[in-house]
Amino acid sequence: MADLTLPTPLVSVSWLRAHLRDPRVRVLDARYALSDPLTGRIAYLGGHMPGAVYADLETDLSGPVQPGGAGGRHPLPDPAALAAWLGSVGVGNDSLVVCYDDPSTGQGFYAARAWWLLRWLGHAGVAVLDGGWTAWLAAGGEVSTDEPSPTPVTFVPDVQADLVATAADVQARGAGTLLIDSRAPGRYRGEVEPIDRKAGHIPGAVNRDWSGALDEAGHWRDAQAQAARLDAQGAPTVTYCGSGVSATPNLLARELAGVPLGPDNRLYAGSWSDWISDDARPVATGEE
């Protein structure tokens, strides 16, 4: 079998159409809606890419919520549990994994969460489909309603601890570390808070709404645009959002801009919902 290279961190619809049925390629459908947890699965059952398996944010891509909220609303899953789930849906260490969601819903960040989690487990062969489900349909991509039954394999995790920042890391960060809040401006400023019990942001954070990583059609902006909006030429960065989900497009965007995931491009996984679980932690409002 000829060598096959997966473009990362983004893959085009044309590449996926050409290689969709290659046995090394696995596709994760990560469509979801925070407002209605069943939306994504219903959409998947109504039509998905042939061979794609559904990756549920709550049950597959997150761990159990802890009493008191420590770890946030979408805690990182246990690495062994995530690895076992990946193996159960046919994703092995040699698999080339493509993740997609539907950016037309305004919540095009679930595929990036899946991408980041695989990278956290040490899996380099993973990419997000540029343009997602919308682009696939626009290009005439095949749609299936069959639920696949992939052969289980073994996925051995190699956890990359330096991709993650904790609340203690955020508190102890030096002046040279940039802290990015990926939520909408109103939530960052503390003017509205539709989900969490406190409004505002972590003191010292700057606001870079995750949606700026995409253009109006749901495609990812180029490396130069990402570097400009994320100040990617300089300080190491810790990025957060409400619960460690919508921050992940900014992490991918920084990688596009030349800063790979690692010590200079980390996710505060618990994010705002973890930060406010301890009332002793300070909260800021307004602009910084």
Predicted feature descriptions by range:
Residues M1-E288:
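Cytosolic catalytic domains that perform sulfur/thiol-centered chemistry
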